[in-house]
Amino acid sequence: AVPLTSYALTFDARGGYRSGSHAYETRLKVSNGWENGWWGSLETDSWNGVHNNSNEVIGLSYNELETNYTIKLDDKWSLKPGMLTHWSKAGTRFGPYLKLSYDVNPDLNLGIRYRYDYNVYRSTDLDGNNARANQHRWDGYVTYRINDLFTAAWQTTVYTYQNDFHYNNHKKWATENAFVLLYKMSKNITPYIEYDYLDRQGAYNGRDNISENSYRVGVSFNL
């Protein structure tokens, strides 16, 4: 999903539904940014069900801690090294990343990010061996402030397994595309809607390789 970034303490509540997997999601997130460049967040995400592929843990309920630091290169370019720590019933995953951001103008921002997801735990691969389902992940970002009230964002993602695993689309790689529209209702309240196309990664009643759409509604509060 597209991150909602601010330089104040923020509480974000979001609900979602995946049409292919027939799964409902609830996420609660607290984040804070500091003027010295540091940013951090803590979130918990719960599902009413999980995917049926034992090697695909994306549908598990989880908790996530993230932190990053912005390095200003000049008035338009910035680097953002960060670390994501993700834990669920399956185990713990670390995701170090580096993001490059460019402000085209005050209303338009572009970004690219590389993240390496390292699983502390092991899973059963396609050959029946115990291995780590580590991933390479590339993200692209476009954020555009339409006017004082509306902001639109697009995030595109490609990720690949490092080892001998497949996603629910029966491939070693998969894609995601997320589109978000935010409405600044007031200084402290910003509701938003989000649509994601998650490739053919749906799984339901023992079937996978199902076209997956995600529909989300949320609201962000500056505290």
Task: Please give the residue ranges for each predicted region.
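Outer-membrane beta-barrel "beta-signal"
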Residues: 144, 179, 183-184, 209-223
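Detector for outer-membrane/organellar transmembrane beta-barrel domains
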Residues: 74-80, 91-165
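Residues that define the transmembrane beta-barrel architecture of outer-membrane proteins
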Residues: 22-26, 30, 59-65, 92-96, ...
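Outer membrane beta-barrel transmembrane domains
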Residues: 153-186, 190-198, 204-206
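Repeated loop/turn-to-beta-strand initiation elements of outer-membrane beta-barrel proteins
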Residues: 9-11, 36-42, 72-81, 106-112, ...
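Outer-membrane beta-barrel domain signature
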Residues: 15-21, 27, 52-58, 84-89, ...
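Short glycine/proline- and aromatic-enriched beta-strand/turn motifs that initiate or cap beta-hairpins
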Residues: 5-55, 60-62
